[in-house]
Amino acid sequence: MSGLRAQRLAARRAERRRAAGRGAMVAAACVVAAVGSITGMVSALDDDRGTDEARPQATRSPSLRPKPAVPSAPEPSPPPASPSSAAPSPSRTSSKPSPTPTATKTKETVAASARLYRYPDSQVLDWVADNPTDPRNEVIKSRIADHPAAVWFADYTPSDITARVSAVTSGGSGQGRVPVVVPYAIPDRDCGGASQGGAPDLDAYDAWIDRFAAGLGSEEVIVILEPDSIAQSDCLSSAERIDRFASLARAGRVLKEANPKARVYYDAGHSEWNAPDKQAALLGKAGAASAGSSDGVFSNVSNFNPTNAEVTYTRQVLDALDAPAGLGAVIDTSRNGNGAPADGEWCDPAGRKLGRPPTLSTGEARIDAYLWVKLPGESDGCKGAAGAFSPGYAYDLAR
């Protein structure tokens, strides 16, 4: 590693330590209680334990605890060479680990997501750079680190949010690629659960969204607006739900007015949560059916349900929403390559695999993109600290 590269990495880590010290808000946004025994995180290769220690990062993706789901049949990971092919039928025979990727497969997979932006400041990229001789390095690099993933903004810091969002969107526009950003600061998020946090009230949230929108720039960007904010709103009173949905509708308008090329998607939960008509009714109250505030819905964030189930579900939601013809859906495929675990486990469950690579060309009507919204390898809280990168977990997903 060159001296300049080492200096840059050291400076970036120092900035992360300063960011982590800004207070408990980030921790509250990202921490999920560890479940089960830490002894379950032994590396497949049983190498130096030090390389498995996770480093916290201020903008990592929080762990969203999914609603207990009916077990899903696993979905085979399709060949990366044909990401636009229709979702295959579920098959129980697909639970075998995927083979180690070849150089050809890596090249084809990267091409599938070429229009999406890979933000260069991430835990997985740091780990790959810091551990070049680790025997897991090539698999993690080629199958995870080389692919674009969403950038989360989970801490309520109004003073610098515009600059932080702009750093991502300007990086994407500079390369002619599309970044994916996730504002995650709605008050009372996670219904007081492990990922609770966010803005102190809706007035503060509205002001924060204004500043977030100011960083969107003028080129294409995808906004995954507040995961779980609609599907998981049962804990609110009727009046509180009305107020939240009004703020979400306002947020969509503000984001699209700030950047007309921004594509804003609203929370549809996932296929094993609310029924499509119930979810559509909630979405309609939050502005998701209006072309002035919405480009459609997203599903399966941080979850494991197979892509074909989510394709069917999101189309049903859009139909029930009576949405304008141009509205579509995006699906998180980051960890759904082997379907949901039979026991409903949500915290770093064993046997999960990477799903379809991120792409804006799905080959499916009304499905605008397959995205990696949850960053593969970032723990739910059982394989490592919640939201922190675990190379052992990443390797298990990727191999």
Language-model segments: which ranges?
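Hydrophobic faces of well-ordered beta-strands that scaffold small-molecule active sites
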Residues: A112-P120, D126, A150-V151, P179-V181, ...
